């Protein structure tokens, strides 16, 4: 069993899927910590990513899964890749993101080993071309995470212990990540934060958050954000005890 499973949900990405994956594998070649495998859950209807993985499996240990279920739903694809991962630590990485620190996996393992945490976030930056980066960010737990105020980052900034993994709620699209973070904190407490910048989020028009439907805005003293009101209504029912309890987490009591 590998120490780390790098979990990558994939799809065609309008013809750029293999290019983005190749960038990830370039970063994995350079990692100082090499006790890992790669798990891919592929929503593609064609076999381009399958063929790429078959070829590169000569160099890397890869578990490839063709996932025909719920195509187009990121949460379902992430769940599939986590469900089939065998590593002690699961490192999530979205297909269009990439490593920018050759010690990323080493630092993630160290984060778990030295803190005894169950899950963690790490710093991230942004890129448009996969080379130059800008706007470095250190994750921060803020108020109203459940409602979509996200200063933590995307799932690409997350690593969790396999034995404590939870699955994403496939009823959600826009708030699927922050609702997942909320449940993880309820169950396992605050995540450990690694301030180092380990990955870059690729900015482009096809990014998931760029193609979502919004119909409402939540106001906050430090800024507002767009949401889907139906998802907010759903969360108010699903997590009614949290709202009744003045939005307090167990580790705050």
Regions found by a protein language model. Name each.
Residues 123, 178, 192-198, 203:
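Catalytic beta-strand/loop signature of glycosyltransferases that borders the donor
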Residues 23-35:
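Short, acidic, metal-binding catalytic loop of nucleotide-sugar glycosyltransferases
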Residues 68-79, 104-166, 205, 210-233, ...:
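Flexible acidic/His/Gly-enriched loops in nucleotide-sugar-dependent glycosyltransferase catalytic domains
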Residues 35-45, 65-67:
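Short beta-strand/loop segment that forms part of the nucleotide-sugar
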Residues 87-98:
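Short beta-strand-to-loop acidic/aromatic patch adjacent to the donor-nucleotide binding site
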Residues 174-180:
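Acidic donor-binding loop at a coil-to-helix junction in glycosyltransferase catalytic cores
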Residues 79-89:
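Active-site nucleotide-sugar/metal-binding loop of Leloir-type enzymes
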Residues 42-52, 71, 94:
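A conserved acidic beta->alpha catalytic loop
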